[in-house]
């Protein structure tokens, strides 16, 4: 974008012969069209954070020149944080793999909106089997996820192949600040629920416990991270 603006400014500031000017105008128009196409195909969002940017990775059949289009998702400001506020993450991982090898494969960023039996429903309205698509990850309402799916040509339907968290982080020695029944909070920043939390056998988090956790990005009330695994370090 900055390069295109610089070229436009330079074009209007200098004098050129008519032939060069015509060629330059054509080149600038092509660049601008390419940029608009890239933004139009790749960018998009859902209001109220109900779902994340749709189709931020384009499929192999949408291309400009020889290179497939790629773009980073336009995340809400609260979600762009690399780790929970005020905490130092040991690692923060973007759980994005390389482009799917099959041309019919798609990548969708969305949020989990409801859990019904063994099927989950996301912001774009299709369900998937927890056992088949989620592997070691157990999604929860509000989790931001990346869904890899294929279009069934014979049925015109979508089949989810893999569901994983959009981003996760590892944090050491964080404190349980409060608990309320089956839910609780770490460092007043990270939400957790015993309904979807991996714990050592026999351990139940209590206030002031010091723990190591793995957290995923999740849109909960007042919180943007959810603990999915917890190991006690110091129990009071």
From Swiss-Prot:
Predominant localisation class: cytoplasm
Outcome of gene disruption: Knockout mice do not exhibit any gross abnormalities and survive to adulthood. Homozygous females are fertile, while the numbers of both litters and pups progressively decrease in hemizygous males over time. Males are totally infertile around 32 weeks of age.
Superkingdom per UniProt: Eukaryota
One GO term (biological process): spermatogenesis
Alphabetized UniProt keyword annotations: Cell projection, Cilium, Cytoplasm, Cytoplasmic vesicle, Developmental protein, Flagellum
GO cellular component: acrosomal vesicle; cytoplasm; sperm flagellum
Keyword Lipid metabolism: no
Compartments (UniProt record): Cytoplasm; Cytoplasmic vesicle, Secretory vesicle, Acrosome; Cell projection, Cilium, Flagellum
Region (Disordered): 57-84
Cytoplasm as UniProt keyword: yes
Expression sites (tissue/organ): Expressed in spermatozoa (at protein level).
Function: Plays a role in spermatogenesis, possibly acting in the regulation of the autophagy pathway.
Self-association and partners: Interacts with GABARAP; this interaction may be important for GABARAP protein stability. Interacts with LAMP2; this interaction may be important for LAMP2 protein stability.
Listed name of the protein: Cancer/testis antigen 55
Source species of the chain: Mus musculus (Mouse)
Name of the encoding gene: Ct55
């Amino acid at each position: 974008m900055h390069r295109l603006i610089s070229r436009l400014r330079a074009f209007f500031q200098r004098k050129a012969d008519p032939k060069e000017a015509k060629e330059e105008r054509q080149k600038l128009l092509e660049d601008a069209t390419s940029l608009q196409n890239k933004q139009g195909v790749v960018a998009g969002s859902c209001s109220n954070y109900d779902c994340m940017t749709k189709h931020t990775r384009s499929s192999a059949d949408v291309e400009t020149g020889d290179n497939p289009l790629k773009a980073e998702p336009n995340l809400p400001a609260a979600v762009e944080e690399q780790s929970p506020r005020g905490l130092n993450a040991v690692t923060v991982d973007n759980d994005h793999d390389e482009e799917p090898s099959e041309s019919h494969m798609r990548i969708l960023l969305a949020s989990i909106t409801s859990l019904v039996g063994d099927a989950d429903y996301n912001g774009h309205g299709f369900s998937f089997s927890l056992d088949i698509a989620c592997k070691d990850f157990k999604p929860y309402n509000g989790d931001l996820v990346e869904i890899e799916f294929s279009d069934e040509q014979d049925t015109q339907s979508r089949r989810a192949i893999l569901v994983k968290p959009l981003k996760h982080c590892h944090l050491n020695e964080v404190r349980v600040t409060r608990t309320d029944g089956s839910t609780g909070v770490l460092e007043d920043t990270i939400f957790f629920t015993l309904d979807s939390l991996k714990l050592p056998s026999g351990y139940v988090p209590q206030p002031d416990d010091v723990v190591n956790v793995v957290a995923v990005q999740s849109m909960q009330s007042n919180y943007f991270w959810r603990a999915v695994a917890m190991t006690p370090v110091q129990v009071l």
